[in-house]
Amino acid sequence: MSIASVSDLSEGQSLKFEFVRAGQILEGVLVRFKGQLLAYENRCQHLPLPLDYGDNRFFTKDGRHLMCQMHGAVYEPTTGVCVRGPCFGARLAALPIAIARGKVWLAHGIAAAKPAVKRQNGRADRQKDSGPKRA
């Protein structure tokens, strides 16, 4: 399922979305870092809590890492590996994505459940055209 348009995210932005896997609704985050689009489950590896603590902030202030807002675990954006904090060496659960026809798609077997929410300029904006679509 399509979760976003490729053009929805500028460098250093994040986009939160819900998806269904094995009958469970889970939360994911799509980030653009160094030109790459990457997707992870929105779940810290230290404790099973959202990285953003509900405020849709994923990047550190300097924009170089992803960070868990609860206990400060810091993750390398391109690999998902924790480089500092209580779960050092653990890896965020990556979500397989593909880019086709100008859209970012979740892998087969994972379905988008709700429209994406993009983090931009200190506020979250609900995306009008990036919600779940039937294939």
Residue map of PLM features:
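N-terminal pre-ligand scaffold of iron-sulfur
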Residues: 1-62, 76-77, 91-135
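Short cysteine clusters
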Residues: 44, 68-71
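Short cysteine/histidine-rich metal-coordination sites, predominantly Zn2+-binding motifs
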Residues: 58-68, 82-90
